[in-house]
Curated annotation (Swiss-Prot):
<keyword id="KW-0067">ATP-binding</keyword>
<feature type="binding site">
    <location>
        <position position="24"/>
    </location>
    <ligand>
        <name>[4Fe-4S] cluster</name>
    </ligand>
</feature>
<dbReference type="Pfam" id="PF00148">
    <property type="entry name" value="Oxidored_nitro"/>
</dbReference>
<dbReference type="GO" id="GO:0051539">
    <property type="term" value="F:4 iron, 4 sulfur cluster binding"/>
</dbReference>
<keyword id="KW-0411">Iron-sulfur</keyword>
<dbReference type="InterPro" id="IPR005970">
    <property type="entry name" value="Protochl_reductN"/>
</dbReference>
<comment type="pathway">
    <text>Porphyrin-containing compound metabolism; chlorophyll biosynthesis (light-independent).</text>
</comment>
<keyword id="KW-0149">Chlorophyll biosynthesis</keyword>
<dbReference type="GO" id="GO:0046872">
    <property type="term" value="F:metal ion binding"/>
</dbReference>
<dbReference type="GO" id="GO:0036068">
    <property type="term" value="P:light-independent chlorophyll biosynthetic process"/>
</dbReference>
<keyword id="KW-0602">Photosynthesis</keyword>
<protein>
    <recommendedName>
        <fullName>Light-independent protochlorophyllide reductase subunit N</fullName>
        <ecNumber>1.3.7.7</ecNumber>
    </recommendedName>
</protein>
<comment type="subunit">
    <text>Protochlorophyllide reductase is composed of three subunits; ChlL, ChlN and ChlB. Forms a heterotetramer of two ChlB and two ChlN subunits.</text>
</comment>
<comment type="similarity">
    <text>Belongs to the BchN/ChlN family.</text>
</comment>
<keyword id="KW-0408">Iron</keyword>
<dbReference type="GO" id="GO:0019685">
    <property type="term" value="P:photosynthesis, dark reaction"/>
</dbReference>
<keyword id="KW-0547">Nucleotide-binding</keyword>
Amino acid sequence: MTAAVDTSNTLHFQCETGNYHTFCPISCVAWLYPKIEDSFFLVIGTKTCGYFLQNAMGVMIFAEPRYAMAELEEGDISAKLNDYEELKRLCLQIQRDRNPSVIVWIGTCTTEIIKMDLEGLAQKLEAEIGIPIVVARANGLDYAFTQGEDTVLASMAQRCPEQVQEEERETRGGLQALFYGLRSGKKKEEEGFHPHPPLVIFGSVPDPVVTQLTLELKKYGIRVSGWLPAKRYGELPAIEPGTHVVGVNPFLSRTATTLVRRKKAKLIPAPFPIGPDGTRAWIEAIARELGIPTPGLAEREAEVWRHPQVQEYLGLLRGKSVFFMGDNLLEVSLARFLVRCGMTVQEIGIPYLDKRYQAAELALLERTCEEMGVPKPTLVEKPDNYHQLQRIKALQPDLVITGMAHANPLEARGITTKWSVEFTFAPIHGFGNTQALLELVTRPLRRNAALKGLGWEQLVREEASV
């Protein structure tokens, strides 16, 4: 085993057989239930799943969140109870108390092991109670916790209509229609857009990011027909054969496959809009596929890089090295962004890598390394944590981006760390969130500098006198 950084002209791929130290994918409920405002998520699992949700999402005593646990007991596992009747009772209670537009069943490891036919039960129950029931098997058998969102969106993609009636199209717009009336002035609305096939963007991001990316595309005359997921289940985008689709997150390969194979959509191969360079490449890929020019886009990116606050953050990163242990499948995009910021990426550990879906991102990473004159990193799929720790000890990186399980042990050994899970929940997409992304990356470096100024950079062991 060598600790040297790969300096070859191409990206070097390795595959180890390490364990997956990551959150359970059912944690996707944390950011999906606020995103889909009229939904209710029912996690079907054991007490362990319930404890995890309580710890990961907080115990909401005074609020009634739109998710719940259907706890499997011994009678369920031994097939002594009628699963259909139990789930029917719970769904009727949810319908009575919360009246959602859609109920999402989240399968877990236990439902997989006991071979619970959730799809068959959902189809029968949906017809009986009259509420759409979407089944997503977001269990711990996946590689990374972010793939829970991928499973949910892949299931929802199959519910997208092929066409929307003109009357329904006019009323779409959610709550705005209640306050401002139906849409009017269709000709005026069409002004400023180039004629092109429908474009649907998939991936769950905060509403301000949805607005930012939609407006960025609008500047070049590109109309976004819809987002998956939509804010309301009834506003799922229409996806007909030939609709162009593009993702905003690198962990949505299953959703992309479903859209292409089941809905006959056309996937736009694009990097992901993380950082100014990624956002520019994302817009360029969409515009190139649709045959639309993007004047001034390069200057738009340069303007973001020239911002004084961004320059201050870049000064902290230039010349430093970073090591990714692998956690949430955002590693390749973040590595590409940090190379553009002037850092050297020593290794990219990643739980799972879909080379087809991330082909454009990998190509951009390779091109960025060449332009910045830094060695191309080694990508290690399913990394073995023991070997990773040996490589970290040999390479001594300035920053390690890792899961929470390894952060404190590494800090105790004098290695500066950053929790990778923070990048999952923070708004990091688009031009407008560049400062927020850099603030996240530089926080441990700024913290260490502040502690060093106070003379607290070393841990001192003292004998306790009891």
